């Protein structure tokens, strides 16, 4: 169980959310944090190891995903803290709870990187949409935050799909 559900420790930050809403929102932002941290790591791994004729364009686009994922991870972690939920971005938590498939080691072709990034972005987007649905009633502020991030993720998924073009 992630720290989002840990209510045994004293919480120095009070939330204006009722406990049930706080639990739902906390679980949503913790899950988003894990997925976004892993997405940033996957994109950076791909960035270092991409090879092929489209190296430069894919390499640069991967940096954009890294920047987005890192900024969004910080945003959702701060939302967790703001509602009195301690965020857990430890490597062990990310490895255990991420919804992104394992990324291969070694050099990887630009085509394979693009396919892997589409899959990773889609996996995170699907999970984010579930979180959007889950937070609609209990915490529209968290929902709004997740909607904005999901829009950015889906934009990058589209851009990577456009990289593949008709083949």
Where would I find each of the regions flagged by the language model?
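Short amphipathic alpha-helical segments with heptad-repeat character
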Residues: 23-33, 37, 63-66, 70, ...
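Acidic, low-complexity proline/glycine-rich segments
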Residues: 1-15
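Short, charged, low-complexity loops and linkers
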Residues: 15-30, 101-112
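Charged, amphipathic alpha-helical segments and their flanking helix caps
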Residues: 56, 63-74, 133-150, 154-158
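A structural signal for well-ordered alpha-helices, especially hydrophobic packing surfaces
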Residues: 33, 40, 47, 66, ...
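Helix-loop segments that flank and shape redox-cofactor active sites
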Residues: 16-24, 39-64, 127-141
């Amino acid at each position: 169980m992630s720290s989002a559900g840990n209510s045994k420790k004293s919480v120095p930050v009070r939330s204006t959310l009722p406990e049930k809403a706080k639990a739902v929102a906390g679980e949503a932002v913790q899950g988003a944090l894990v997925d976004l941290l892993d997405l940033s790591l996957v994109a950076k791994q791909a960035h270092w190891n991409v090879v092929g004729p489209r190296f430069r364009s894919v390499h640069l686009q991967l940096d954009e995903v890294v920047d987005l994922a890192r900024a969004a991870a910080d945003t959702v972690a701060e939302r967790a803290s703001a509602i009195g939920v301690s965020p857990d971005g430890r490597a062990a938590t990310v490895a255990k709870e991420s919804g992104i498939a394992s990324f291969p080691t070694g050099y990887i072709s630009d085509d394979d990187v693009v396919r892997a990034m589409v899959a990773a972005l889609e996996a995170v987007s699907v999970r984010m949409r579930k979180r959007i649905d889950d937070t609609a009633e209990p915490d529209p502020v968290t929902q709004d935050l997740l909607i904005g991030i999901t829009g950015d993720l889906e934009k990058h998924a589209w851009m990577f799909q456009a990289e593949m073009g008709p083949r």
